[in-house]
Amino acid sequence: MKLIINGLEKELNCEKISDLLNILDLEKDIVAVELNKNIVHREKFNNTKLNDNDKLEIVTVVGGG
């Protein structure tokens, strides 16, 4: 399916946000995900289905000092 991730079009085979994060090798505990301009809470990653042409913004949390 075609997804727009952080402004870039990608062709990926994933059903849910949790699948997408696995494909992108991202840990759910260190990311924030927006799906079609709606924030998705971590506890819903396993149940939130993706559709063709969905737009996602994925932000990784990085600690520092």
Task: State each model region's role.
Residues 1-64:
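Ubiquitin-like/PB1-type beta-grasp interaction modules and other compact soluble beta-rich domains
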